[in-house]
Each structure stands twice: as structure tokens, then as C-alpha cells.
Amino acid sequence: MRAQTLVFVRGTNLQLYRGSRTQTGWSGWASMGGLLVDAAGVGAPAAGQADVVVRATDASLRTRTYRDGAWSPSYQLSWAAGPLPAPPAGRLGVDWTRIPTSSKVVALTFDAGSDAAGLASIRTTLTSRNIPATMFLTGAWVRSYPALAYQVADTGFLVGNHSDTHLYLTQRTDAQVTAQVTNAETTIFRTTGVTGKPAFRFPYGDVNARVLADINRLGYVPVRWTVDSLGWQGTSGGMTTAKVVSRVLAALQPGEIVLMHLGANPTDHTTLDAAALPTIIDRIRAQGYTFVTVQSLTG
């Protein structure tokens, strides 16, 4: 990544941790999870030795050592992502429209499938107010904006899978549905180093019992929404910032899942969700609510 430094360290618990520094500052240390392939066999570098760690295209970490004026023959596998647990059985068979809770929590979610015109503003609003959020990314969007996709994950937002090319999945075969999901997952993981599992959002909200079963079989919990802000319709579709705020507040309830978008309306190029977000957050907070990701739903 441009203007970014990644640092990997082994903790006293023998787990691997990652930190990064960009123009915006130091991220702090975050556990990588996964599998330490070399376990405790690799200690601190010896005097006169340098260990170089790189991330491979499969998101694994590989280490090469420079010692006594020469490099080791090849990069050795040091870390690989571990298998994820299966979604909770109680979360299967449903395209969830809200988090099942009586607590006053709201999940802000953002779909990324077109452009990224609103992302900078949305990211600034969320980070400056310390608000967690969930970003549903398509594989196509990640391939178009790899640096921004990495930034989304590195900022700490929860990442979900929104299919590869945003098709109506009920019109596809089971094999095609599988390809849409797995291709997106591969792209997300290789680009960002994080998985989109287990949160999945159907493109257009297009779902039936067959494709719902497909998604569950692939290890995902579908996350729909309680309210669509309709900011994506833009001013050309009759929406305004005030209307976006009103729609979200009118649906306010414990466990509300709000759908917004990172991109602009393709006709008028407005980013109403980004513009409305500060007011939405302030007014929801004023009613005693806090914000969560959908992780409490997906497990």
C-alpha cells in the first residue's frame, strides 16, 4: 500500500499481531487470529539478522531472513488464516431484518457496489464519532478500489460479502450463486486480509428459500435491513438529506439495521447518505441508543 507501513509482532502469548501506520496515524495492535504455522520455533532475530515478512496473494504471511551477507533460499510460510466457526444454528434459515434484541442498539450498514464517492466523508464521520459500522463489499468494487477496500478493513469496520458482481441471485443456478459468493470472498480476503464471513447481503434484497439455503451452506448469515434510507435515489429521485434522516428515525427501534450506500447517485452524483450521516448519528444518540456492527447477529 502507498504511504503505509505494516508491522507484525509475536506477542508473549505466541499469537501474531499487526499494526499499521498511514497518513492518518498509528492503528494500534490487532490480533491476526489464524494459525501460527511456525509456532514458537521462530524467536527474536539474532544479531546481524533481519527477518522480512510479506503478505502473499492468499493473505498468508511469509518470512525470509537475511543473515551473514546472504538471504535464505525462499520465503517460508509463517501464518495462515484459520477456519472460521460455523454460524450459530439459530441464525440460519432467515434473511434478518433486525438484530433480535430489546437493547437500544442500531447497526449502521453501508453497501459498496458502484463507486466510492461518499466513502471519505462517511469514514470521517464514523471515526471522528467512534461509531462502529458494517461495510458490505462486492468483489467488483474491491477490484476497482483495492486501496480503499484495504482502508475500510484497516480502519476496523466489519466487512461483509455483497456478492461478486451484484446480480439477482434468484435468477442464477446454485453453482452460479456459489461462484458469486466465493469469488467475492477470495477477492476481499486477498485484498484486505480479512474475511467477509459470516455476514452476507443479497444484492437488491433478492432472495428466496433456495438461495437462502445456498448462502447458509456456504457459511454465511444473510443480513437484510430494517430501513433503506433511499439516499441512493439522489435528488433526481426526489430524495433530500432531510428525507433520508426522517426515514431512518421513523424506523428507529431496538436492533434496527440501517441500509445506506458508499457511492453516489449515477445521475445527479449526490451522496445523500454521507451528507445525512452526522445528523442521523446525533439524533439516534439523543434518544439513548448506541451503535453496533451486525456481528452480534452473525456470531
Label for each model-derived stretch:
Residues 1-83:
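A structural motif
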Residues 2, 128-130, 154, 217, ...:
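Short, well-ordered coil/turn elements that cap or connect secondary structure elements
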Residues 12, 57, 113-114, 140, ...:
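Short, glycine/serine-rich, charged loops/turns that create anion-binding
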Residues 84-172, 176, 180-197:
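Active-site beta->alpha N-cap acidic-glycine motif
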Residues 121, 143-144, 166-290, 295-299:
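Catalytic domains of cell-wall/extracellular-matrix polysaccharide-remodeling enzymes
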